């Protein structure tokens, strides 16, 4: 067997997107023949799936599965909303959610190892779907919520909510889930707002207040007002109710005898930064490469 040079490994890596060890192994199997190595990798599906893995998957779908007193929200990402509506993508996302819930796991690494059926793991099924559809597809995150009274709502493919509550009418939970989908609260009550978020908002309110140049006693009131305004926007019971904006959610809950125990809200692509193409820079780079 001829020695595989680093240059050959780099060439195969650049052309397939695979890791160095996979490229070296593929080249060893073909005695350094790059084209044959690529053909072999394409036949096995590795090259295409690995190349797509470098693409940013910021679209996708939120799926919800429920069994008894447990429900799961799962986000599966792809690159375009067109693929997010594809039946194969939808089937994969729903099945993965059901498997994760049945195995009571939200760990993405653990989910990838679950038995998908037909002799495949979830990860192997994902790779096969990448090959079939032609986009990067990733299982991003999952959350399980438990409760005797669960209600869910999905707004299109992009937003999913599950609420655990006690009391109220049959449609109380559903209406509440719709409200949470629309207004995106961070907590049920003031005391549930994370301390680090409150501290950050207080710093922002103080910085704005001090720009006014007013006396300290006035600044303190301005800070309190800024925090109060922030809490009105992000705390569920303080928000104007989506079904009747003349009422606060807290007042509606009290009148209906509803207690919110917990909720989970997922929105597709939260926190994922989409790549912004700079076509002028891309053309300039291509011209520079051609000139070399």
Swiss-Prot record:
Transmembrane segments: none annotated. One of its GO terms (cellular component) is cytoplasm. Keywords: Cytoplasm, Elongation factor, Protein biosynthesis. One of its GO terms (molecular function) is translation elongation factor activity. Pfam families: EF_TS. Its main location: cytoplasm. InterPro entries: EF-Ts_dimer_sf, Transl_elong_EFTs/EF1B, Transl_elong_EFTs/EF1B_dimer, Transl_elong_Ts_CS, UBA-like_sf. It is found in: Cytoplasm. Residues 80-83 are annotated as: Involved in Mg(2+) ion dislocation from EF-Tu. Belongs to the EF-Ts family. Associates with the EF-Tu.GDP complex and induces the exchange of GDP to GTP. It remains bound to the aminoacyl-tRNA.EF-Tu.GTP complex up to the GTP hydrolysis stage on the ribosome. This is Elongation factor Ts. The lineage of its organism: Bacteria, Pseudomonadati, Pseudomonadota, Gammaproteobacteria, Moraxellales. The gene is tsf.
